[in-house]
């Protein structure tokens, strides 16, 4: 993996990632394809919205279809017919979300499969092996996602376990498996700056190809998340990619880019589309609202996606009211293209030196003031 920093405006960065299956321009949003499919999208649709990289999930693919099936296809790329880069989440977050169904020990995590109730064991080594079989371009370490809220003591204990696991992940990925693909560390520590520092410094000692901010978007108020983003990205290596996991709303992504984050993923655009909530240049359209029954305009006049070029809001309203599958499909195409256009717009503005104007326009269209952002002297 190679990461080049191509430009900067304040803390916002313009970069380029070169991976085994292609080049990724940053800032970038990665559509989530948990089970080896982005819900409601054909692989050609994902190409049409100009996604450069997608996300798969180690935990779910390990349970179904299992490694043997994917091995027979020579990896996840051939299995799902996607020839561009793939990042895989290690499974740590999914194990965290199982709650009482899991037991965490030093060796790893034992849990009941949410599919058939059978006992399953996941460890740092097993996670690395699964992701090696998947042939992920970016492999994430197996960690414990610190819950919110957590006391200082709980968050510290959790991050120290994650650091010991991180060391095992690196050893297995590099030394045992000889995997040449990128391996990213994940910073934990809850909402405590001293613990975030401890986690980051521990990961830097081990050494990774990129660094992710974990443990956000887990139920904390937005102010708490912004507080972490005010200080943490700027402490992360300036010559490595920075990834904010599981975030988020368009405003959250803009604010994180302003603070120096490069990569994002979130289920929000796909999930919201299935509920008739569409992201547009001026904010949000809730298509089930009866005011759209006779609306002859496109969903977003500024959008170049298949949905906006071909269908009216009235038609989308009709599909939603009828409970038609096509409503979710067209909505997902649009929402994911919106997120790609958002990050494209930021890249373009960073290239042209007009990033501040981009941010002003983004908020002005929503009738909002630009929030404050830390400035380096």
Curated annotation (Swiss-Prot):
Gene Ontology CC entries for this record: cytosol
Pfam families xrefs: TGT
Residues where substrate binds: 89-93, 143, 188, 215
GO biological process: queuosine biosynthetic process; tRNA wobble guanine modification; tRNA-guanine transglycosylation
Disulphide bridges, residue numbers: none
Region (RNA binding): 246-252, 270-274
Active site: 89, 265
Reactions that this protein is recorded to catalyse: 7-aminomethyl-7-carbaguanine + guanosine(34) in tRNA = 7-aminomethyl-7-carbaguanosine(34) in tRNA + guanine
Binding site for Zn(2+): 303, 305, 308, 334
UniProt key word Membrane: no
Pathway of action: tRNA modification; tRNA-queuosine biosynthesis
Enzyme Commission number: 2.4.2.29
Cofactor note: Binds 1 zinc ion per subunit.
The keyword ATP-binding is assigned to this record: no
InterPro entries: ArchSynthase1/Queuine_TRR, TGT, TGT-like_sf, tRNA_ribo_trans-like
GO molecular function terms listed in the Swiss-Prot or TrEMBL record: metal ion binding; tRNA-guanosine(34) queuine transglycosylase activity
Protein origin, superkingdom: Bacteria
SUPFAM superfamilies, alphabetized: tRNA-guanine transglycosylase
Cofactors required: Zn(2+)
Keywords, comma-separated and alphabetical: Glycosyltransferase, Metal-binding, Queuosine biosynthesis, Transferase, tRNA processing, Zinc
Assembly information from the UniProt record: Homodimer. Within each dimer, one monomer is responsible for RNA recognition and catalysis, while the other monomer binds to the replacement base PreQ1.
Family assignment from sequence similarity: Belongs to the queuine tRNA-ribosyltransferase family.
HAMAP family named in the record: Q_tRNA_Tgt (MF_00168)
Role, per record: Catalyzes the base-exchange of a guanine (G) residue with the queuine precursor 7-aminomethyl-7-deazaguanine (PreQ1) at position 34 (anticodon wobble position) in tRNAs with GU(N) anticodons (tRNA-Asp, -Asn, -His and -Tyr). Catalysis occurs through a double-displacement mechanism. The nucleophile active site attacks the C1' of nucleotide 34 to detach the guanine base from the RNA, forming a covalent enzyme-RNA intermediate. The proton acceptor active site deprotonates the incoming PreQ1, allowing a nucleophilic attack on the C1' of the ribose to form the product.
Descriptive protein name: Queuine tRNA-ribosyltransferase
Species this chain originates from: Acinetobacter baumannii (strain SDF)
Gene it is expressed from: tgt
């Amino acid at each position: 993996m190679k990461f080049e920093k191509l430009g900067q405006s304040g803390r916002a960065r313009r970069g380029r990632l070169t991976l085994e299956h292609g080049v990724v321009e940053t800032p970038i949003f990665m559509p989530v394809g948990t089970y080896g499919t982005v819900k409601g999208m054909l692989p050609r649709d994902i190409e049409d919205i100009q996604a450069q990289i997608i996300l798969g999930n180690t935990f779910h693919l390990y349970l179904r279809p299992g490694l043997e099936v994917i091995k027979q296809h020579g990896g996840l790329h051939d299995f799902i017919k996607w020839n561009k880069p793939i990042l895989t989440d290690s499974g740590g977050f999914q194990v965290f979300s199982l709650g009482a169904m899991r037991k965490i020990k030093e060796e790893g995590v034992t849990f009941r499969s949410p599919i058939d109730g059978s006992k399953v064991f996941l460890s740092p080594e097993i996670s690395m092996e699964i992701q090696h079989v998947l042939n992920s371009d970016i492999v994430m370490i197996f960690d414990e996602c610190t819950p919110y809220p957590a006391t200082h003591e709980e968050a510290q204990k959790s991050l120290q376990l994650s650091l010991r696991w991180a060391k095992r992940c690196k050893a297995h990925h590099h030394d045992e498996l000889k995997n040449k693909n990128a391996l990213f560390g994940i910073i934990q520590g809850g909402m405590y700056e001293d613990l975030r520092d401890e986690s980051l410094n521990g990961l830097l000692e081990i050494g990774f190809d990129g660094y992710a901010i974990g443990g956000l978007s887990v139920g904390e108020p937005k102010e708490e998340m912004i507080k972490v983003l005010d200080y943490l990205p700027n402490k992360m290596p300036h010559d490595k990619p920075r990834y904010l996991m599981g975030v988020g709303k368009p405003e959250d992504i803009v604010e994180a880019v302003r603070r120096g984050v490069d990569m994002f993923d979130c289920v929000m655009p796909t999930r919201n589309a299935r509920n008739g909530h569409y992201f547009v240049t001026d904010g949000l359209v809730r298509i089930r609202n009866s005011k759209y029954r006779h609306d002859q305009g496109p969903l977003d006049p500024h959008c170049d996606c298949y949905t906006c070029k071909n269908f009216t809001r009235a038609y989308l309203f009709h599909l939603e009211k009828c409970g038609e599958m096509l409503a979710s499909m067209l909505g997902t195409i649009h929402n994911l293209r919106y997120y790609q256009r958002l990050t494209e717009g930021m890249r373009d503005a960073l290239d042209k030196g007009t990033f501040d104007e981009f941010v002003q326009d983004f908020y002005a269209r929503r009738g909002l003031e630009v929030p404050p952002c830390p400035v380096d002297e």
